Each structure stands twice: as C-alpha cells, then as structure tokens.
Amino acid sequence: MPSAQSASITIVYMGDSITEGQYVHHSLRWTTLVTAALRRQYEAGGSEFHFFFNRGVSGETTRQGLERFPRDVQNARPEVMTLQFGLNDCNCWDTDLGLPRVSEAAYRANLVEMIDRARRFGTRHIVLSTNHPTLRHRVLAGGQSLETRRKHYNEIVREVAAATRVILCDIEQAFATIAPEQLKDMLLPEPDVLHLSQAGHQHYAAAILPHLQRCVENIIRREESAA
C-alpha cells in the first residue's frame, strides 16, 4: 500500500443536506465516517497529511452550489472532490406551479460547470454520486412524485459522469439491495423519510469509500513516482 507521507491531499465533499448530514450528529455522518476511515488507512505516526472539508448545505440546489463554488471548492483547490446534488433540484414547489426548482437541462449544465471548474483548479479526481431512494411517493404539483423525479435526475447524473469521464458512485444501486420494507430504517422517520438515518449514513459511507480509497492511492503513487 502506498505511504500517505508522500502526499498532502485535500478532499472536499460538495453537496446538499445529504452531504451535510442534516439532522444526524456530525460524528455519524457519512463524510465523517469516510474521513475517519481514510485517516486510519493513510495517515502515519499521528501526522496530518490530509485535509477534509464538508461543503454540504441543506436545502441547496446545483444553482446555489454553483454560486458558492468559488468560495467552497476553488479556494480549497482539492485533489479530490465528491459531488452530490439533486433531491432539491428535482423537487417541485406549489409556489412554482409545478415547475422543478432546477430544470433537467439546467441541472445537467450546473453539474458539468462544477466539474469543469474543479478541474481548472487542479482537482484530479471527482466522484459524482446519484441520490438514494426515499419514501416520498406523494404526487407533487408537477404531477409526479419526488421519487419518480429523483430517478429522472439520477439518469442525468449517470449521463454527466460518462460524458465528463468522472467517477460515478451509483448510490441508488448501492441502496437497491435493500428490501423496500427495510428502506425505512435507512431514512429518518415520518414525516421526513428522505434524509439518511444513522444506518443510512453507514451504508452510504460503505458505498463511496472504495472510490475515495482508489483516488487517494492513485495520487500517492503519482507523487511517489515524481519524487
């Protein structure tokens, strides 16, 4: 295994409330679990070789994320970035007469621009995630449930990942192994049934951690080869 002593790596977790870990103690959030696992695996002798920033903001869409991107990502110049948005983008408010908060076309464009900007500022590896299943089946003002719309926006995520050649972490597929009657244990109870529970964060962390481990190992090997 490569030694972390050869590289100083910054990772930014960029996203909405799912990345922020809303309503769950910070020690139980998937970003904290992943950070702890990476530190245990790659840091030696108690020295700090890695820097982690959670830049998840509750309630935000890709449009709002793009507006704060210079401050929250570009300024950090991370080697690795995780990118997760969509559950707010696909939502349809009554006050918008059924229109999504962010259209499918704009959602796609916003993801691509964030990827382009991250790369321009030196990000070597980008992990783009689909969004997990929820139990939000009530029909929204636009005529579809949040669950139906989530699936549409997840397809956009997959298409963007393929087109931009970033790493796809298919969280939806990772949760597909969970029986429908057990999904409620992965989510906060009614009336939420959208945000991840402690068990949900653990499952999410297990799905995304291998991608980040490969990113870190790739960077460390490149640093050692250049030394």
Predicted regions and their residues:
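Serine-esterase "nucleophile elbow" of acetyl-processing enzymes
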Residues: M1-S58, R63, R68-R77, L183
